[in-house]
Amino acid sequence: MPTKSFHRTDRVSAQVRRDLGTIVHAAVRDNGLPSVSVSDVEISRDLAHAKVFVTALQQERSAEAVKGLKEIAGQLRTQLARAMKLRHVPELHFHYDDSVDRGERIDNLLRDLDDVGPEATSSDEDAEQR
């Protein structure tokens, strides 16, 4: 039976995502930033850098949220170091995760397609066949 190997970076990434999620939640409240949640963390092989992907509850304020997180990244890293028992805590680089927005857009397009109904699509197909 093949076993799935877990690399240290995967384990550290999962732990950073859990701990940083809690830390960011508190920091957002304390610093008056728009609400965000940590959706994913990618850590470099040498554990020196972490790409932290966040999603904003208010998409129009996402740039403001990411900018605010970048400004307090040093404080967040210090709090993360206290929470984790690592010799070296990765440098945090915040990025907006637009996958939720893209998924919502696709969902809306599919709903619009359902609203059009099968009559419109069959007449389009008839026109293409001529």
Curated annotation (Swiss-Prot):
Gene this chain is encoded by: rbfA
Subunit organization: Monomer. Binds 30S ribosomal subunits, but not 50S ribosomal subunits or 70S ribosomes.
Coiled-coil boundaries: none
Protein name, per record: Ribosome-binding factor A
GO molecular function: ribosomal small subunit binding
Record InterPro entries: KH_dom-like_a/b (IPR015946), RbfA (IPR000238), RbfA_dom_sf (IPR023799), Ribosome-bd_factorA_CS (IPR020053)
Region described as Disordered: 111-130
Pfam family, one: RBFA
Chief location: cytoplasm
Organism in which the protein naturally occurs: Xanthomonas axonopodis pv. citri (strain 306)
GO CC terms: cytosol
Stated role: One of several proteins that assist in the late maturation steps of the functional core of the 30S ribosomal subunit. Associates with free 30S ribosomal subunits (but not with 30S subunits that are part of 70S ribosomes or polysomes). Required for efficient processing of 16S rRNA. May interact with the 5'-terminal helix region of 16S rRNA.
Gene3D superfamilies per the UniProt record, alphabetical: 3.30.300.20
Compartmental location: Cytoplasm
Similarity-based family: Belongs to the RbfA family.
